Structures are given as structure tokens and as C-alpha cells.
């Protein structure tokens, strides 16, 4: 198994519902180390830039509106096979299809307000981490 980093967002609905601590506890119980974290309120420009690959798709404007509706938590998780394992604990994008006990099954309010985002590949994790964190904001721990 390979030690990897992945990028994670706790979305506005989960922040508003005061679920940050519960979600962080799940990350840590799953063996992840949180090596960078911060709270921010995305501007429209930041959200459009982050989700640029989805521009022109029918859900894009609603996604940007939702992601700018309140504060979010962004974090870098480190662990063995972090990208896939994080996707496994998040559950299906549509919370109606998410397995019981996954983050989306437990903390989502709707398809758009599905509580969390996670990188889908090592390459996207690197890009997404760099979008929100400078190298000196990441603190690996042994």
C-alpha cells in the first residue's frame, strides 16, 4: 500500500449543521492524519475556479451557489491509499445511494448538499491541495 494525500471539503451544510467534529473523528478513526486544515468562505470566483471542469454542465451554477452559501472546511488527509479509502468512507455522490455508515449517508441534506467532497485520483488531489494550501501550510506527522 502507498502513503498518499487526498483533499477533502466539508461542505456548507455540514458546517452549518455543526458536523465538523463528527466528520473529523471519522477521518481519524479510519486511520487518516489531518495534516492541513482551514475554514473559509469561498467567493464565486474561487468556487468557479475550483469546479472549472464542470463549467457548462447543468448543475454548475447551483453547485457554485451552494458552495458559496456559507463557510466550508478544507483539509488534507494523509494515509495508506488515501484517495480511494476517503472515497469509500464518503459514500456515493448521491446520498440516496450511499451505504449506511458513510459520511454522505449520515450527514447529507440533499444531492447537492451532500456534506463532503473528496479527490477522485492522486493527480486531482495534488491539484486540489495546491488550489487551497501553500506548501508551508501542510504539516506531515509521523
UniProtKB/Swiss-Prot annotation:
Cross-referenced CDD domains: NDPk_I
Reactions performed catalytically: a 2'-deoxyribonucleoside 5'-diphosphate + ATP = a 2'-deoxyribonucleoside 5'-triphosphate + ADP; a ribonucleoside 5'-diphosphate + ATP = a ribonucleoside 5'-triphosphate + ADP
Classification via Pfam families: NDK (PF00334)
Binding site for ATP: 11, 59, 87, 93, 104, 114
Gene3D superfamilies: Nucleoside diphosphate kinase-like domain
GO cellular component terms, semicolon-separated: cytoplasm
Needed cofactors: Mg(2+)
Subunit structure: Homotetramer.
NCBIfam families on file: PRK00668.1
Family note: Belongs to the NDK family.
Protein name: Nucleoside diphosphate kinase
Amino acid at each position: 500500500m502507498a502513503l498518499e494525500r487526498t483533499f477533502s471539503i466539508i461542505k456548507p451544510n455540514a458546517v452549518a449543521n455543526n458536523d465538523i467534529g463528527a466528520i473529523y473523528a471519522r477521518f481519524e478513526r479510519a486511520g487518516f492524519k489531518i495534516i492541513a486544515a482551514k475554514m473559509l468562505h469561498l467567493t464565486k470566483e474561487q468556487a468557479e475556479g475550483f469546479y472549472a471542469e464542470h463549467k457548462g454542465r447543468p448543475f454548475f451554477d447551483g453547485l457554485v451557489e451552494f458552495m458559496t452559501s456559507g463557510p466550508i472546511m478544507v483539509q488534507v488527509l494523509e494515509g495508506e491509499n488515501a484517495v480511494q479509502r476517503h472515497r469509500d468512507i464518503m459514500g456515493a455522490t448521491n446520498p440516496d445511494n450511499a451505504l449506511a455508515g458513510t459520511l454522505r449517508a449520515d450527514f447529507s441534506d440533499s444531492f447537492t448538499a451532500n456534506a463532503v467532497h473528496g479527490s477522485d485520483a492522486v493527480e486531482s488531489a495534488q491539484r486540489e491541495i495546491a488550489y487551497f494550501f501553500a506548501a508551508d501550510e501542510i504539516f506531515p506527522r509521523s
